[in-house]
Amino acid sequence: MNHKAQNKKQAKSSALAWTKNAWEDYLHWHKNDTKIFEEVNSLLDECLRNPFDGTGKPEPLKGNLSGYWSRRITKEHRLVYLPEDNGIYVIACRYHYS
């Protein structure tokens, strides 16, 4: 299978879903900070490939967010997501979870 076909197959099998707040966070970075926006995109790509390992110090969350995972975007901001069979469900990509 050629590279283009592999990418197309992966795109169909991996999906991103967003909460309203997470999407607003994402648009905030798009408008206000290109560097962080690019980092978020990089982390999202990596989460789709392997939601439990990689950059950003992935860690499972506890308490009310049990089942969700977090990756560090910056010292202040985290990407918080729920790994699912067909992709990830993003609940935040701005500020620290609490």
Residue ranges and their predicted role:
Residues 49-51:
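Blade/loop signatures of beta-propeller domains
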Residues 1-15, 21-24, 28-38, 42, ...:
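Enriched for short, Lys/Arg-rich terminal
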